Amino acid sequence: MRVLLQLGLLALGAVCVCAIPKQSATLRALVRETLTLLSTHRTLLKGNETLRISVPAHKNHQLCIEEIFQGIDTLKNQTTQGEALATLFQNLSLIKKHIDLQKQKCGEERRRVKQFLDYLQEFLAVINTEWTIEG
C-alpha cells in the first residue's frame, strides 16, 4: 500500500513538472502566433487614422499592462472584425487571461523576513538587468 502511495505521488509530481514547461511553451507559441498576426494585419488595424490610443511614455512594459490591454480593447471596439482579426484579438484575450492568473499569485501567504528579502533581492536584480531605467 505504501509503495502504491509513493508511486502515485511520484506520478503526480511528474505530471506537475511536465505541465509547467508545456504551459510555458504553449504561451510562447501563442505569443509568437499573435506577433505574426499583428505583423500581417498591421495595415488593416491602422485603417482608422482618427482613433487615438494611450501609449505609455516609458518602456517598462511590466508596469503598463493595464494600459496596454485598455488600448487593445479600444482597438478591438473600433476595428471592423474579420476572421483573421478575430483570431488576433482572441489570442490577445488569452494572453491577458494568463497574465491575470499570474497576478493572482502576488498575494501569496506571509513568510519570514529572510524569504521576503530573498524575493526583494531577486526583484531588484530583475529591475537592474531587464528593465529600461529612465532618468
UniProtKB/Swiss-Prot annotation:
GO biological process, one term: interleukin-5-mediated signaling pathway
Keywords carried by this UniProt record: Cytokine, Disulfide bond, Glycoprotein, Growth factor, Secreted, Signal
InterPro entries: 4_helix_cytokine-like_core, IL-5
Signal peptide: 1-19
Glycan attachment sites: N48, N77, N91
A GO MF term: cytokine activity
SUPFAM superfamilies found in the cross-reference section: 4-helical cytokines (SSF47266)
Domain of life per record: Eukaryota
GO cellular component, one term: extracellular space
Subcellular localization, as worded in the UniProt entry: Secreted
Function in brief: Homodimeric cytokine expressed predominantly by T-lymphocytes and NK cells that plays an important role in the survival, differentiation, and chemotaxis of eosinophils. Also acts on activated and resting B-cells to induce immunoglobulin production, growth, and differentiation. Mechanistically, exerts its biological effects through a receptor composed of IL5RA subunit and the cytokine receptor common subunit beta/CSF2RB.
Matching PANTHER family: INTERLEUKIN-5
Assembly description: Homodimer; disulfide-linked. Interacts with IL5RA. Interacts with CSF2RB.
Family: Belongs to the IL-5 family.
Protein name from the UniProt record: Interleukin-5
